[in-house]
Amino acid sequence: MRSEPQASAYRPDPRIEAIADWIGDPVPAATFPKHELRFRNDRWAPTVGLADLPDDKWIAHFGRFEPLPKNLPQPLALRYHGHQFRVYNPDIGDGRGFLFAQMRDADGRLLDLGTKGSGRTPYSRDGDGRLTLKGAVREILATEMLEALGVNTSKTFSVIETGEALWRGDEPSPTRSAVLVRLSHGHIRIGTFQRLLARDEKEHMETLVSYCLETYPGNEPPVDAPRREEPAVILLHQVVERLADLAASWMVAGFVHGVLNTDNMNISGESFDYGPWRWLPQWDPRFTAAYFDHAGLYAFGRQPEALLWNCGQLAVALRLLADTEPLIAALDRFGPLYQQAMARRFTWRLGIEPQGLEADTALIQAAEHSMVKRGEAPDQFFFAHRTGRDPAQDDFGQLLRSYRPLAETDSLFWQQASPPGMLIDEVERIWSAIDQHDDWSPLHGKLADIRELGRHLGSPPRPQGLR
């Protein structure tokens, strides 16, 4: 069974202040006509010492954004550029969110509280700086399901409905508004480095690399890696390790992020910033989540390619500090690291003991073929074959029989017909109950089911590239 997050005292540590002058802009939060608490993450609030906040104080901090004690005195809208569908855009940054606070958890990790829908900033362009309530509900569902499936993801920390009528082209409008707070392991994006390259800010690039190496400590590069002692080279090796593992975790989860732009890539390797995400209704490498992704650039099967491409853009930015050869050597590790992560995470979700990369890769290929042939959803597939049970009469079944189970499936949870899933029809039903009847019980019931799934899957593999 999976252990619960470890509680900690409140330990403020706004380290971002050391680089705040050139990485962000102080901004005020929006003033909202209403503050109705819809979700507070009482599972993760203890990890940063905020579990004991009464609801009125919670709303004061996460709806009105009164500063937390000894933390950032004013929110910080972060500056960055980014490739959006591989077209470079220098006119972006935190357009409807900001960094609100930083604190340490029980293990000493620096965690951020950042927002979505908290008002206009210097980077809002034509946007209103707001978030729809439906978007907030979708983010709760995505982060909870990804966490259950072992993905290193941001956590939805708070959702407060704010009483405004919003107009959106991709939702029936007017629609309800909300402000969301996420708990995450940093908000430094690949696009943060791209901005410094575009502005030729070499000293700031050096400082940012040092900040990231200190704040998000990872592994040393391999002993034979060229220039392995250089900070920029070390950082790229670590980010490659993290994003290769992230790509594998999405694939094993059957998850399609939808918008893998460089401004959506956190150098800590944490999955975040959820928009038009979907879960696979069946194993299909061509499946896309975003209705506007007409070319399938960020299709399910192209997600590893997209993350490698994004690592390449980080390498381009780091050319301001390092030679090309050692950076290419770091990028060349992505493929093998991804294959290793796939084997590690695939066997974990099946609840079986790994047999080595070659055998595990053959099992994965046979499993993919089996799912495609049967038109089977990954959630149902992993549930049906957990610990090697019910092996099919095909190549996958033959290979699966040789694996030793590492988990138990004796509990009533594993005897039900199907596992908790997150297909779009159910997401829409959950939202419809809220939208039409202000009925939040389907959401709460779904979250309970998801958390039970996480407990029964047990502790996932540790994210790679982080100490």
Label each region the model flagged.
Residues 34-37, 43-54, 62-224, 268-270, ...:
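Conserved ATP-binding subdomain of kinase catalytic cores across diverse folds
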Residues 14-20, 111-122, 209-213, 282-292, ...:
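Active-site-adjacent bridging/hinge elements
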Residues 28-30, 128-130, 233-234:
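Short, contiguous strand/loop micro-motifs
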Residues 136, 166-257, 268-353:
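ATP-dependent phospho-/nucleotidyl transfer catalytic cores
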Residues 259-265:
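Hydrophobic HxD+1 residue recognition
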Residues 1-80, 289, 294-467:
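Regulatory N- and C-terminal appendages and interdomain linkers associated
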Residues 7-14, 25-28, 108-113, 174-180, ...:
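Short, functional N-terminal and low-complexity linear motifs
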